[in-house]
Amino acid sequence: MRPPKNELPAADATRISRTLSYLLRHAPQTIGLRLDPEGWADIDELIAGIARLGHPVDRATLETVCATNDKQRFALSDDGRRIRAVQGHSTPVVQRRYPAAQPPERLYHGTATCFLDSIRAQGLIPGARHHVHLSPDIRTALAVGTRYGVPVILEVDAQRMHRQGHTFFVAENGVWLTDAVPAEYLTERDAPAR
């Protein structure tokens, strides 16, 4: 039995989401896709580029992936003609401007134990991305950390950082962003049992 037209099998949704993340965050040039400084791309150009990769996708499927993605990674423009990744960009073309926001008392970052020595030495840095990504809750941070090995949760004293001049932003999907988190604002927490 096939799923209804507006539902995708989980494996297909994951594959398409990963393709969109790669193209809209990191490598639009691989399909000749143009992004504006806010990360928007023309949906028709994206569909044509993905088809050239041998993975045809239609507009309805893109809309379904955007609407059902558990992390709300993608956004469609109000007129339905453009699409973008909400955050996570590494391509220098994109320089999204997020509104500054006052963070909650604590934010969280999920990582793996193998990265702790580096984090203890230099804090959290964005690496190839434009910002450090922080979660508003431990469960989300744990899911992120689990992807990379034995997870550990880093608690960020976000209010103290903010009071001391660090700027925070919040993306449309609830992911908190900042330029870096110095080690002095981090506390290691054991990952809770799943």
Where are these regions (language model features)?
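Eukaryotic, polar/proline-rich low-complexity intrinsically disordered regions
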Residues: 1-194
